[in-house]
């Protein structure tokens, strides 16, 4: 092999090695930041009731479910909160220290992200409250009632006066 080919081959191999190392580092970083989503039943029993798919202790996960009524315990000296989450099966305890979302309450759906410290205990770093897509804050709803009712415009929850009058008119003409 002549020296020119040898130098080209070494440059190509060096570039391929660099790309391989960069790809490996990117994949390693992504693997560290992946938070798999589980329901409380899947945390306890594994996905599809297969025990080898259970999350391991120390793994970062996201868990979604309903806050079990009567399980919210707040520490009066700090922002620490402890509550249980469940779906249709067993419960998982969530420990969180921080300010909870305004929509957080018992019976409400939430998603908690954190590290599994015991088979059924999650140390959460983030808690998100779910709400339906038709949610309107009470202050905004009161404002909408004040503004839209006199105009006969629908307030997203009840039909407007104009809609009712049209319906009565159509029913009367049939």
Swiss-Prot record:
Q: Which GO terms describe its molecular function?
A: heme binding; metal ion binding
Q: Which family does it belong to?
A: Belongs to the CcmE/CycJ family.
Q: Where is this region: Disordered?
A: 149-174
Q: Extract the NCBIfam families matched here.
A: PRK13165.1, PRK13254.1-1, PRK13254.1-3
- Annotated compartments: Cell inner membrane
Which residues span the membrane?
Answer: 9-29
- One Pfam family of this chain: CcmE
GO CC annotation terms, alphabetical: plasma membrane
**Keyword NADP applies:** no
- Mapped to this chain, the residue ranges on the Periplasmic side of the membrane are 30-174
**This protein is called what?**
Cytochrome c-type biogenesis protein CcmE
Q: How does it sit in the membrane?
A: Single-pass type II membrane protein
- Compositionally biased intervals (Basic and acidic residues): 156-174
Q: Which residues of the sequence carry a binding annotation for heme?
A: 131, 135
């Amino acid at each position: 092999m002549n020296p020119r080919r040898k130098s080209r081959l070494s440059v190509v191999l060096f570039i391929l090695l660099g790309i391989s190392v960069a790809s490996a580092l990117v994949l390693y970083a992504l693997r560290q930041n992946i938070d798999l989503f589980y329901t409380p039943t899947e945390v306890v029993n594994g996905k599809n009731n297969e025990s080898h798919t259970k999350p391991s202790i120390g793994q970062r996960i996201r868990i979604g479910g309903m806050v079990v009524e009567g399980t919210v315990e707040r520490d009066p000296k700090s922002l620490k909160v402890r509550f249980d989450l469940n779906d249709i099966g067993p419960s998982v305890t969530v420990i969180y220290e921080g300010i909870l979302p305004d929509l957080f309450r018992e019976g409400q759906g939430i998603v908690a992200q954190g590290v599994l410290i015991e088979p059924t205990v999650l140390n959460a770093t983030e808690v998100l409250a779910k709400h339906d897509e038709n949610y309107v804050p009470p202050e905004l709803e009161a404002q909408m009632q004040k503004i839209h009712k006199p105009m006969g415009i629908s307030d997203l929850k009840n039909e407007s006066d104009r809609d009712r009058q049209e319906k009565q008119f159509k029913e009367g003409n049939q």
